[in-house]
Amino acid sequence: MSGTAQEEQIRQIVKAADAYLYDAKAGGYRLNTDFHERKDDLGRMFGFAYGHKENGAVFSHMTTMYANALYQRGFAREGYKALHTLYEQAANFEVSRIYPGIPEYFNDRGRGMYHYLTGAASWYMMTVVTQMYGVRGRLGDLCLSPKLLAEQFDEDHRAAVNVEFAGVPIEVAYHNDGLCDYGAYRIDQVRLDEAEIEITPDRKVSIPKNKVTRLSHDRTHRIDVRLVPIESSSNRKVR
């Protein structure tokens, strides 16, 4: 998340986390492996039975922060895996036994514990909006930089999110007619309520704040973004 790890180190971190910590039945990534002993001299976490709270549970806050860091570094598929597993676990009522939402953690049986106690839900939403859909502010301007996977687009090859920016309701809709995966598409065209927005040569989109604040607040405005395949000569993921 701080940007310290090099790309190869990130790959190794993901490989290790998947090998030692990922448990789909429990809801995703555990905090640690089972040390098979009680270690009270190492603090609070080892005072719990394995699979509960800080000792090896699937801790929602840490998972969402891990996903956020992966997205920031361009590892969208790996970040999506972390978020989607949490969602699927929470939505599986027969196992999680909770109302819709993100609990503090999932225990060894995959049951959601301490509902509404965690900040993970806000981290989850922030990551989905600002990283997955790539809708975020920068020095007051509205920037678009999606990291959506091919399978996240619907039957119309569309993926959309509703946000409020500078008090203005906005729907951002991405159109991916080629159903390209992240890293294989680029932004080709952007329209704000049918008015075309300029795209910089490096294909980054930044809508000035004054253009947004001039919009009416009493209706939802629409930003349509067309994604097209990156030319084969430069078809590589940019981290």
Place the predicted regions along the sequence by residue.
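Short, surface-exposed loop/turn segments at secondary-structure boundaries that line and modulate
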Residues: 44
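Non-catalytic C-terminal accessory modules of carbohydrate-active enzymes
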Residues: 15, 19-24, 34-38, 47-56, ...
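Catalytic-domain carbohydrate-binding cleft regions of carbohydrate-active enzymes
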Residues: 31
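An alpha-helical repeat/solenoid feature that recognizes helix-turn-helix modules
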Residues: 1-6, 59
